[in-house]
């Protein structure tokens, strides 16, 4: 499954696609877990192990695709009024994606351990008589044989060794692929960690700007208050001066009137 681009910058549709992928990853992880539980039982078979590998690789591709979608979602432009809501939505998607990845990586590691255990049993059973009862009849036939005459046993021994080597190579190839896929998921975890860190820096910057704006508003209000106080004091002083001048004029007028009288 290859990565397909977003949905024309529509955040709602992109968020829906991310949520859908997260649900698929969770569902696939549960299916992988059920398949792992069948290994070593009568239901075990080479076909079952092949299905397990295909399901694991499909889920790994889903995880890579979702990682790209979340990056795209985080880079979409937004208005100041929608910024907080967009952050809440992205935080929720990242948290859900992280939870689904954690569970998926858990079953990945279980699958790798099961494959390693199987290879070890095949190697051991190729050196001793008899097989291992945990594996299915199809795979058990590759490494077990019945007591026969010495020439027949030697011939069968050679056939089993060749089949065992082929089986070991297949399983070791599967182990290498699983380990590579686990590393891919580790890289996605790093991406998510970086996104959370960068988003935190952006939010801190926004909050700092808001705080600075609030400080500026408070300072402006204080300056306006001081200006109003100064204006009131100036008016009061002017009124007092005018009152004194009026009194002075009246007194001078009375003095002049008294002299003339």
Swiss-Prot record:
Task: Enumerate the transmembrane spans.
Answer: 239-259
Hey, which stretches end up on the Cytoplasmic side? 2-238
Q: Which residues lie on this side of the membrane: Vesicular?
A: 260-261
Any idea where this protein resides? Early endosome membrane
- Protein keywords: Acetylation, Coiled coil, Endosome, Membrane, Phosphoprotein, Transmembrane, Transmembrane helix
| Gene Ontology biological process terms from the UniProt entry | intracellular protein transport; organelle assembly; positive regulation of receptor localization to synapse; positive regulation of T cell mediated cytotoxicity; regulation of protein localization to plasma membrane; vesicle docking; vesicle fusion
Kindly report the protein's main subcellular placement as a broad class: membrane
Phosphoserine occurs at 45, 75, 125-126, 129, 205
GO CC terms: azurophil granule; early endosome membrane; endocytic vesicle; endomembrane system; immunological synapse; late endosome; perinuclear region of cytoplasm; recycling endosome
According to its UniProt entry, the function of this protein is described as: May be involved in protein trafficking from the plasma membrane to the early endosome (EE) as well as in homotypic fusion of endocytic organelles. Mediates the endocytic trafficking from early endosomes to late endosomes and lysosomes.
Protein name according to UniProt = Syntaxin-7
- Organism source for this protein? Bos taurus (Bovine)
